[in-house]
A protein has these predicted regions:
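Formylglycine-dependent sulfatase
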Residues: 1-272
């Protein structure tokens, strides 16, 4: 039996109720809704950590963040920790990573200045890539190297690669580029790590594609958001627009897999 290709599509700070398959009334996620209908929809899924770096350390290592010393941001995943990529590599898979990593840099406290182990805006050396060997288009802290319509990641050789167009589209394009160059000799494990719909730290807002605000103004407010507090009225349409962009990009990725004859033997997992 031919071993399947595996793709993990990972979004950042995406609520479960942004998807139609979980009750979102607006047309935010038609592609993901179709995948949920045709495949498996998880009804109970939990993250061990609510913060970027720690949550990623759990997912990559299969261990609690406290076990791998990644209990807060700005703590690098130890190089002796065996990861998903290591296990897939040992099993004869190509390993590929695209997008936000957030597991390479170290500092003594979250508010302290970085020492020489700062890769927030620099290329991540191979030994800090968590075992991803064959294809790499990533930045450690994508918030620090990008905005909605500008930014960059680094390739396998450490060369800076500038975005063209909207950020989520660019990240997805790097994944599609990998699929186009894939030779089929080995099965692949591809991890796509988007930053959307994470807020833009240095701008204090959610940076959606152009036109998203107008498209998603007729939303229903989730019950857990206080009606009389916060700035959700200003930001929620853009937040949904970012989620919709991810859905469109998942659709483009699936179309590429089908065009290349890879879809029937590929498992795609979407989570946040």
């Amino acid at each position: 039996m031919k071993r399947p290709n595996i793709i993990v599509y990972f979004s950042d700070q995406q609520r479960w109720d942004t998807l139609g398959c979980y009750g979102q009334p607006l047309s935010v996620s038609p592609n993901l809704d179709r995948l949920a209908k045709e495949g498996v929809k998880f009804e109970n899924a939990f993250t061990c950590q609510p913060v970027c770096g720690p949550a990623r350390s759990c997912l990559q290592s299969g261990k609690y963040a406290t076990q791998v010393n990644c209990h807060r941001n700005a703590l690098a995943l130890p190089q002796d920790i065996k990861t998903l990529a290591d296990y897939f590599h040992e099993s004869g898979y190509e390993t590929a990573y695209v997008g936000k990593w957030h597991l390479a840099s170290n500092r003594s406290s979250y508010t302290a200045p970085f020492d020489e182990e700062n890769y927030e805006t620099r290329a991540i050396p191979p030994e800090r890539r968590g075992g991803y060997r064959d294809y790499w288009m990533a930045a450690d802290v994508l918030e620090a190297t990008s905005h909605g319509y500008d930014g960059y990641v680094f390739d396998r050789e450490g060369k800076k690669c500038e975005f063209i167009g909207y950020r989520a589209d660019s990240i997805n394009n790097y994944a599609i580029n990998y699929l186009h160059q894939y030779d089929g000799e080995k099965p692949f494990f591809l991890f796509i790590s988007q930053i959307e719909p994470h807020h833009q730290n240095d701008h204090g807002r959610f940076e959606a594609p152009d036109g998203a605000r107008e498209k998603f103004t007729g939303y229903e407010l989730p019950a857990d958001i206080p009606v009389d507090k916060g700035d959700w009225k200003e930001h929620y349409p853009d937040y949904l627009g970012q989620c919709h962009s991810l859905d469109e990009n998942v659709g483009r990725l699936v179309d590429t897999l089908k065009a290349r004859g890879l879809w029937a033997n590929t498992i795609l997992l979407y989570t946040s």
